[in-house]
Amino acid sequence: MADFLISIATYKRPDLLADLLRSLEPEVAGKDVRIGVVDNHAEGSGREVCEASALDVEYVVEPRPGIAAARNRGLDLVTDDDRFLIFVDDDERVQPGWLQSLEDAQRQYDADVISGPVISVLPPDAPAWISRGGFIQRARFRTGDPSLSPATNNTLVRLDYLRSLRFPRFDESFSMTGGSDTAFFRALRDAGARMVWCDEAVVHEDVPAERANLAWIWRRGIREGNVSGRMLLRRQSRPKVVLAGLARIAYGVAATIRDVVLGRGVQARSAAYITRGIGWIGASRGRLVAEYARPTEPVEG
């Protein structure tokens, strides 16, 4: 039994996992907290880090490949008496006061879901257009505002609410493409969850140099569009999704031209219409963007 279970899915990033665990040490001091690490590497690359941690880490291996499978194994660690489940990613570090901020916001707003900002720290030699255009960095809101797109990178969930829904699971058809957390929290919203933003509950992530480039940002945008397109297809026909995708591309191109003409350069908000539209059309054709596929693991779909 604990007030909080912090669930961390990891895969072959022991150094980053160690940084995260160290950042959690002052946060959990004096609080009733369990920490569960689910290693999606069958050989257990995170085991030594967890055993060496000053924290009492519950470490398990989920050999089935895929981020959704690891997240579901994290759900399996929940006990009947746990009150809140908190998701953080293995490549993040929590800011001092993070846990207290989540706790205070949940109490103040009586929310079922509380999420906070993820601050992306670009490498020093990252191209200037990335930060100037708002790429990679996520939006922030005022504390108390609705949380529009919770994810497993910095989110608290009231477990009694999950129990009232008979404990929904992460959709493993999204394991290799990503997006299982988007689908999970969208289902909670559709079920009536009260989702609130807490701007003080900050985590940081260092952006690897190999991601600070146009090719990765473009592919990530299409992948995110592909995921949202697959979810949209559950409610709308393929022709409607294709037409909506084409409309988004057209709007995004026009908005990007406007941004450039006005001297703002390429802006992430405008470019996202283009990549999302491409992703929607790809989803309508049955194409998956398997960002998390592993060389020996085929992608179905």
Model-identified regions with their sequence ranges:
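Acidic donor-binding loop at a coil-to-helix junction in glycosyltransferase catalytic cores
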Residues: 175-186
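A recurrent flexible, glycine/aromatic-enriched loop bordering the glycosyltransferase active site
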Residues: 139-157, 175-177
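A conserved acidic beta->alpha catalytic loop
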Residues: 23, 37-48, 92
